């Protein structure tokens, strides 16, 4: 088994902007559960983007999400190469994108966003089929991003169904 890749220093993140983004502005440096730490930062940023209204105009939301995903493929791929680790656990930009996809699909409201956070983390950690299948087979920046995007999609669709039923 290959030893875990070491964490970069925060000063290295500041010197290398792609690592600063990939490591979620430093949240990926958390010694335990960096994915959850990154997801919490992503949740806080999303709340800030919406002015705590927990909703954005659809066009702005999907444009922002598309940009985050496209940039994320490049950011995660570059960071993985710089860290010499195919999917370093500290790279959490993919958590940002996945959670934001969940929130884009969620009904508006604080409670829905908290439920989305929890569901997203469950899908991202447990990785049910087909998430695990993609996680094992796809490599590079797209491979790092795809499992979190699928986790975000699954969590968001569950919230949509729950919102329609409730």
Please annotate each region the language model reported.
Residues 47, 65-74, 98, 103-104, ...:
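Alpha-helical transmembrane segments of multi-pass membrane proteins
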Residues 46-63, 102-114, 160-166:
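Helix-coil boundary and interhelical linker segments in multi-pass alpha-helical membrane proteins
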Residues 148-164:
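Final/C-terminal transmembrane alpha-helix of multipass membrane proteins
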Residues 2-40, 54, 73-103, 122-153:
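Interhelical loop and helix-boundary elements at the membrane-water interface
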Residues 17-18, 47-51, 59, 70-74:
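Short hydrophobic/aromatic-rich motifs at helix boundaries and adjacent loops
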Residues 30-49, 60-64, 68:
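Short Lys/Arg-rich amphipathic alpha-helical segments
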């Amino acid at each position: 088994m290959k030893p875990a890749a070491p964490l970069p220093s925060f000063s290295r993140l500041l010197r290398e902007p792609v690592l600063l983004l990939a490591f979620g502005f430093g949240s990926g440096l958390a010694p335990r559960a960096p994915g959850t730490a990154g997801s919490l930062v992503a949740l806080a940023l999303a709340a800030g983007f919406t002015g705590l209204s927990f909703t954005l105009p659809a066009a702005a939301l999907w444009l922002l999400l598309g940009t985050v995903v496209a940039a994320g493929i490049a950011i995660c791929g570059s960071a993985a190469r710089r860290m010499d680790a195919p999917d370093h656990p500290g790279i959490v930009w993919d958590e940002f994108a996945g959670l934001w996809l969940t929130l884009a699909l969620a009904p508006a409201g604080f409670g829905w966003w908290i439920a989305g956070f929890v569901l997203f983390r469950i899908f991202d950690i447990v990785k049910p089929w087909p998430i695990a299948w993609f996680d094992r087979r796809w490599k590079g920046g797209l491979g790092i991003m795809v499992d979190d995007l699928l986790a975000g999609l699954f969590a968001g669709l569950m919230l949509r169904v729950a919102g329609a039923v409730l």
